[in-house]
Amino acid sequence: MEAIRILLVDDHALVREALAVQLSSMVEFDVVGMAEDAGDGLAAAVDLTPDVVVMDIDMPGMICFDAAERIKSRLEEVKIIFLSSALHDHYIESALKIGASGYLHKGEPTESLAMAIREVAAGGVYFSDEIRGRIVEKDGSYSLAEGAKMRSQTLTDREIEVLRYPARGLTKKEIAGLMHLSPKTIESHCARVMDKLDIHDRVELARYAIREGLTEA
């Protein structure tokens, strides 16, 4: 039986390397590559054609869901597993829409990730317990349950990304630098987020991000 070929995508070198060591110690896995952001992950996936891509959600540069969608469009058989500390409904919905096969909380042990990789490589799906109760399956496809859809609001992936930073005490200029965007663009994103959520100041915006777990992504 051939080993399952894995590509790891995470902007934290320690996380990437630790996962690579732990997974490589299991005879059924072969970590064929690592990437530090979604854009590099996309290029590596096309070049290496892994069986499974394990991708962090919170990374600078290209939005992970955009990269994953492009990977799926080019490599239909590749399975995507997302890792994140944030279990915000919008993230879950975005992952399901692009056809992710798994979504795990980063706090879970490596063995849970190993189980997820085995399951998705065999054609199944794997979701953390906290997520299973918020999704429904119909004819082999998964989506957010209606109650969760109501909570996910209408925020875009970029707006969700912007929303994480005010609670960390960062200025718009600092956020712009991290996201490689102009301060004016960040200001526009913040204004749209506040309008959609009916929030009227940055303090309230930060509280919302903390309550939704977005600062832990």
Name what the model sees in each region.
Residues 56, 84:
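Active-site residues of response regulator receiver
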Residues 2-15, 19-23, 53, 155:
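Conserved acidic segment of CheY-like receiver
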Residues 37-40, 60-66:
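Acidic catalytic/metal-coordinating carboxylates
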Residues 28-36, 44, 199:
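Short hydrophobic/Thr-rich beta-strand motif most characteristic of the beta2 strand and flanking loop
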Residues 48-54:
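Active-site beta3 strand of CheY-like receiver
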Residues 169-204:
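Recognition helix of helix-turn-helix DNA-binding domains
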Residues 43, 65-77:
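Short amphipathic alpha-helix used as the core "switch/output" element in two-component signaling
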